[in-house]
Amino acid sequence: MKIVVDENMPHARELFAEFGEVIPLPGRQMLATDLQEADVLLVRSVTRVDAALLASCPRLSFVGTATIGTDHVDKGLLAERGIPFFSAPGCNKYSVGDYVLSALLVLAERHELNLGAMSLAVIGAGNTGECVAGKAEALGMRVLRCDPPRARAAEANEAAQFVDYQQALEADIVSFHVPITRQGPDATFHLLDAAQIAARPAGQILINASRGEVWDNQALLARQQSQAPLRLVMDVWEGEPEPLQALVPHTELATPHIAGYSLEGKARGTWMLYEALCRQLRRTPRQDLQSLLPIPEVREVTPGQSADQALIKQLVHLIYDVRRDDARFRNRLGVAGSFDEQRKHYPERRELSSLQLKGPFAGAALARLGFVCQPD
């Protein structure tokens, strides 16, 4: 069995070698000729799995993406050809949640904000959106959920928990967690369009850790060059891997599509595909996820006080401070190929669950943020 994998997919060789030959290739440069003898194709979001890529792959019997989103895969074409397809829903939801939490705490300190007195709207209340919502609620924030497909499918009593898009946009902070879709009643391409951008109040915080095309980046640039700019946190960009460079200086925080890049998140995505292939071949998995992860540098802390916003910031940034990624991105802006290079060589980053908190102040609020808590 020949298994073609994105070269940047962590742990692919050690997990899939038991099935056959593992062939790592650059994700953005995969060609149909690379798949002529492939039985399994494993990709990330940078590879378009379409008719061109699948032009000559008679042996292909399994396609997987180690990502939550699947907009880069022609699922209809795979179904027509009878090729099973698997993704990794929720694999990096905790990582993205940690990213948003870290960003919120940076902005709160920078602009002297009391997050517990603010509202946050989650656009897209799926796996990732719900994770972000839960962390925001743990901070004491009032959370609004906007997810039209879920609202339509919900029972009447559950549908009441959702708000429409216009209501969501009135929140103090709006965080986007949707796939990119271009057609249908819930299309998300330029969901935040020029009209919506122009209507936003000055200083409103907007966060995008979903897909770059969900926001109209040119319209954002025009707004940011006005006398009433917004506060933007951007992990994703139109035109990746070539972001609109002129927009970057007008953001609060800017990063190269790495919100979901924790060690756990990346390993979990590969692991979910490994489990799927085991099921497909009716094999029992020989390896477990935890065995793939190194021992964290910081494993245990005993807080000396109750969890106020300042302590939460210290604990979160002990594990992940988004400002490091922001500084690296800005320093390398304009360097050819740097967007993908930063993703390929991303520093080791753990999720909040890698830190165990002990003692009388290791309470429920910290556990809801994602820490492992063992109160006395």
Swiss-Prot record:
Active site: R211, E240, H257
EC category: oxidoreductase
Gene that this sequence comes from: pdxB
Species of the source: Aeromonas hydrophila subsp. hydrophila (strain ATCC 7966 / DSM 30187 / BCRC 13018 / CCUG 14551 / JCM 1027 / KCTC 2358 / NCIMB 9240 / NCTC 8049)
UniProt-annotated binding residues for substrate: S45, T67, Y261
Binding positions (NAD(+)): D147, A209, S210, R211, D235, G260
EC number, as in UniProt: 1.1.1.290
HAMAP family: PdxB
Predominant place of localization: cytoplasm
Entry function: Catalyzes the oxidation of erythronate-4-phosphate to 3-hydroxy-2-oxo-4-phosphonooxybutanoate.
Any single Gene Ontology cellular-component annotation: cytosol
Entries under Pfam families matching the protein: 2-Hacid_dh, 2-Hacid_dh_C, DUF3410
Protein name, entry field: Erythronate-4-phosphate dehydrogenase
Domain of life: Bacteria
Pathway the protein acts in: Cofactor biosynthesis; pyridoxine 5'-phosphate biosynthesis; pyridoxine 5'-phosphate from D-erythrose 4-phosphate: step 2/5
Subunit structure: Homodimer.
Alphabetized UniProt keyword annotations: Cytoplasm, NAD, Oxidoreductase, Pyridoxine biosynthesis
GO term, biological process aspect, one: 'de novo' pyridoxal 5'-phosphate biosynthetic process
Cellular compartments annotated: Cytoplasm
InterPro entries, A to Z: D-isomer_2_OHA_DH_cat_dom, D-isomer_DH_NAD-bd, Erythronate-4-P_DHase, Erythronate-4-P_DHase_dimer, NAD(P)-bd_dom_sf, PdxB_dimer_sf
Gene3D superfamilies named among the record's database cross-references: 3.30.1370.170, NAD(P)-binding Rossmann-like Domain (3.40.50.720)
